Amino acid sequence: MIRRSLISRLALSALAASPLLVPGPLLAQDKPVLHVLVGFPPGVGTDNLARMYAEALGEALNATTVVENKPGAGGQLAAQALKQATPQSNSLMFAVDHQIVMLPLVTKNPGFDVKKDMLPVARIVNFFTCLAVPATSPVKDLEGFVETVKKDPAAAGNVGVPALGSQPHFLTYVLAQHYKIDLKAIPYRGAAPAITDLMGAQIPAAIVPCDALVEHRKGGKVRVLAVASDKRYKPMEDVPTFGEFGFKMPADSFLGVYAAANMKPELVKQVTEATRKMFESPKLVEKFASTQMEPAYAGPDDLRSLVEKNTAYWGEQVRRSNFQAQ
């Protein structure tokens, strides 16, 4: 009897220690949590894609992923937060290339160092930039745009861009130099207000992300003149590229993933491999493409090389334009 009682108590003790009986919240504590920083507000294209990525990463690693929006200063606040992240926070940043390439070029003190404070994980998509005019504009193509600006630069030469110091800002400069015309970049607080003014013909032209124009073009509200790339943009395959007009520039922009420099090396390796494997899933690749951006995986080394090339090119345009760092 004593023996049976002892065995019963031992059995109960073993069951109590079993993970199957541990309450849910305790189990959740053992599940890793990854924080994905996004430098833009909820609901915009970058945020939507970041949430798709975070969900896929969580499933791949059996982890909880938390998307944290830190909008402001063109993504600068999110990049600074990545630098300040602790190793225990398991922090990643879903970055637009403006944060990685342009901010260090146009900001006196960005508050982070791309080479020291973050590790490249992968490029996820390319996104394209378009030159567009209102649908009511008499301008029908790039040649017509150039001729119109030459005739009346004061009326036709203002070009809306998403931000001061952005790639579209300096693409305006490149266009002006190439065609020897007088263009003036008019900075907005993001692409959305620039597009609103474009559709209302409050501004004669704009250079903004193509994905933000797809539906407006279908609705007959804007006319897209050219895509800043050397290859055509699938949702607008009838629109010529700047490459077709003789431009040589690394104009494709990208969205990619960076890890905090102090993230545990084993976790960085796991995140990197999980991200690579995402592109083996046609369903997930199609989901990424639904954002009107182009799925375009590149690993850490290729992403690092891409950033170096783009930084060299845009850095030269910044210097030539005599832009004063803010």
Question: Could you say what each language-model-derived stretch is?
Answer:
Residues 31-33, 178-179, 218, 265-326:
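An extracytoplasmic/periplasmic, membrane-proximal ligand-sensing/linker region
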Residues 31, 84-91, 105-193, 242, ...:
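Hinge/capping helix and adjacent helix->loop/strand transition within the periplasmic-binding protein
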Residues 97-99, 126, 136, 211, ...:
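Solvent-exposed coil/turn segments that connect beta secondary-structure elements
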Residues 28-116, 158, 164, 180-207, ...:
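N-terminal (or domain-start) structured segment
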Residues 1-13:
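N-terminal secretory signal peptides and thylakoid transit peptides that target proteins
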